[in-house]
Amino acid sequence: MDYDPIKESLGRHFNRHPLLRKLFYLLLNILLLRSWHVRKALKKLSQTLPSSSKVLDAGMGFGQYSWWMARKFRGWNITAADIKSEQVADCNAFFRRERLGERFRAIEADLVRWTGTGKYDLVLCVDVMEHIEEDRKVFGSFFSMMNNGGYLVISTPSDLGGSDVHSENEKSFIGEHVRDGYSKAGITGKLLDAGFGKVSVSYTYGLSGSIAWKLSMKYPVIMLSASRLFFILLPFYYLAVMPFVILLNITDLNFSHAKGTGLLVIAEKNR
């Protein structure tokens, strides 16, 4: 199933007014479990990062993580890169309107070919690597872009049901994915080969998180792919399921998982 057309429709709708865009960011932070895990990791890393850190949001998408970081960590200077020119233009206009343009800029870039515009203390890469075939090249680029002692944070599907694939005969739920997910050993090995000195990988989307994903993402996407008329029903659907999704997300966030359909990866470049 192609997910990009649905994302683009949602993006255009919520980009009509700054308040709608802020509401969209809030909903993404609540509904997407990966956002909970990423924000928790960033809060922890912020205690060791410089207060004036230079940050790369690699594959920024709608820009919700850059928005959260720019408001949470007032000293951080953020560069956001994305391959889609429309999203780059939208983010730059929105951040300037919100008077954050001095600490944020979005640029159009293909991560496979782009080599950066400077050195970063933190590189954030959420829901990106499953779309890139030449992942080793990108990992190597990230390493070369980073300052010593910097961190790379990745959120990506695992090979244990990520992309909703549970057997060799199944196809990814998201048509744009070039791989169903990474194993812990696989992504660790690639990052070590790229030069990173320490790599930590933990499972996300355990049982409760997988249920939350189905309620918050899978079922709505299936409905919207069937007919755009379901956009009308979407607010009522989310009002009904949101309390359950929040509870499931909190549960997933606060327990460790022996296995899960997602991975949270933190790699450190040696000092």
PLM-predicted stretches and their roles:
Residues 58:
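Conserved beta-strand/loop positions that form the S-adenosyl-L-methionine
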Residues 64, 68, 75-111:
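Class I SAM-dependent methyltransferase SAM/SAH-binding core
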Residues 124:
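A conserved beta-strand element that flanks and buttresses the S-adenosyl-L-methionine
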Residues 61:
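Conserved glycine-rich SAM-binding loop
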Residues 42-50:
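Glycine-rich helix-loop-beta junction characteristic of Rossmann-like nucleotide cofactor-binding loops
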Residues 113-117:
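Short conserved loop adjoining the S-adenosyl-L-methionine
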Residues 2-41, 64, 83-87, 94, ...:
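S-adenosyl-L-methionine-dependent methyltransferase catalytic module, highlighting the catalytic core
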Residues 128:
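Hydrophobic adenine-recognition pocket in adenosine-nucleotide-binding enzymes
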